[in-house]
Amino acid sequence: MPIGTPSVPYRLPGSQFERWVDIYTRLGAERILFLGQEVTDGVANSLVAQMLYLDSEDSTKPIYLYINSPGGSVTAGLAIYDTMKYVKSDVVTICVGLAASMGAFLLSAGTKNKRLALPHSRIMIHQPLGGTSQRQASDIEIEAKEILRIKDMLNRSMAEMTGQPFEKIEKDTDRDYFLSAKEAKDYGLIDKVISHPNEA
C-alpha cells in the first residue's frame, strides 16, 4: 500500500498560524528540490518551474537538487539541464541513492565544486536508449540519426563536465557503467562525497 506524500506543519512568513503542507512544498520554501523518480515531461516541467521561481525570488542563494532517479526521457532531462545552466543561482546537486542515466547527467551538471553524493550512492552512465516498433524504414533511419546526434552531444557535455577525454566517455557509456560515490568523484562526475549537511 502506498504511503502517500507526508504533510508537515508550516507557518507562512508574517502569519501567526501554522498550516499543513506536503513535505515537498515545505522543502521547496527552503530552496530544496527533489528528483526522486523517472525523468518525464511532467517531472521536468515541475522542476523547471520551481527553479525559475526560486531564481527569480533570489538568484544569490543556491538551489539544492537532490537526485534519486533511474533516469528517463532525454528530452525532458535536457529541459532540466538547460534550465540549470540558464538560472543565475548556483545549483547544488546531491545524489541520494541512485543517479542513473539522465539522473547521472543531471547530477554532473550541477555547479562546479557543488556536485555531491552521499557515501553509499550509486551512479550509472550509459548511452541514450532508443527504440522502434513496426515503423517504416525511413522513419527508423531518421530516428537512428537523431539518437546518434544526441549521444554525441551528451558525451561531449559529459566530457566537459567531468574533464575526461571524449573517447573515454564514449567507451564508458557504450554499456551500463556503474560507479560508487568515491569512484564518481575520481571520475569527475561529482566533486565531493559528503556524510553531513554542513558539508554541502
Curated annotation (Swiss-Prot):
It comes from the Bacteria. The active site is at residues 101, 126. It is an enzyme of class 3 (hydrolase). The keyword Cytoplasm applies. Keywords: Cytoplasm, Hydrolase, Protease, Serine protease. GO terms for molecular function: ATP-dependent peptidase activity; ATPase binding; serine-type endopeptidase activity. Its main location: cytoplasm. GO terms for biological process: protein quality control for misfolded or incompletely synthesized proteins. Disulfide bonds: none annotated. The gene is clpP2. InterPro entries: ClpP, ClpP/crotonase-like_dom_sf, ClpP/TepA, ClpP_His_AS, ClpP_Ser_AS. Cleaves peptides in various proteins in a process that requires ATP hydrolysis. Has a chymotrypsin-like activity. Plays a major role in the degradation of misfolded proteins. The lineage of its organism: Bacteria, Bacillati, Cyanobacteriota, Cyanophyceae, Synechococcales. This is ATP-dependent Clp protease proteolytic subunit 2.
